[in-house]
Amino acid sequence: MQKIKSNDEIIIIAGKDKGSIGIVTKIVDSKVLVEGLNLAKKHVKPNPNKGVTGGITEIEMPLSISNVAIYNPTTKKADRVGIRTSKNGIKERFFKSNDKSII
């Protein structure tokens, strides 16, 4: 079971966007895409055949998973994730600071 999943609320702990809070949109190997953060400018050449207008656009770049931590809304801080099995035998993730389950 992964400690960080899609749609998790995370906080960036290193890099130019340090301290920013966002939602994970996609996880690829050991990288995460965070909605609206770690933006880079991409120069797009116009292509009338495909209907693409040229210009400078901003795209989200992946962050290393080691530079993000899950955000705990009750403590309003970065937190660590633990994995435990419930009495039903189902694995669940929980915050290590206050032992609450992650929804």
From Swiss-Prot:
Function, in words: One of two assembly initiator proteins, it binds directly to the 5'-end of the 23S rRNA, where it nucleates assembly of the 50S subunit. One of the proteins that surrounds the polypeptide exit tunnel on the outside of the subunit.
Annotated gene: rplX
GO BP, sorted A to Z: translation
Keyword annotations of the record: Ribonucleoprotein, Ribosomal protein, RNA-binding, rRNA-binding
Family: Belongs to the universal ribosomal protein uL24 family.
Cellular component aspect of the GO annotation: ribonucleoprotein complex; ribosome
Keyword rRNA-binding included in the entry's annotation: yes
Molecular function terms from GO: rRNA binding; structural constituent of ribosome
InterPro entries: KOW, Rib_uL2_dom2, Ribosomal_uL24, Ribosomal_uL24_CS, Ribosomal_uL24_KOW, Translation_prot_SH3-like_sf
Assembly with partners or alone: Part of the 50S ribosomal subunit.
Database matches in CDD domains: KOW_RPL26
Organism: Vesicomyosocius okutanii subsp. Calyptogena okutanii (strain HA)
Lineage of the organism: Bacteria, Pseudomonadati, Pseudomonadota, Gammaproteobacteria, Candidatus Pseudothioglobaceae
Designated name of the protein: Large ribosomal subunit protein uL24
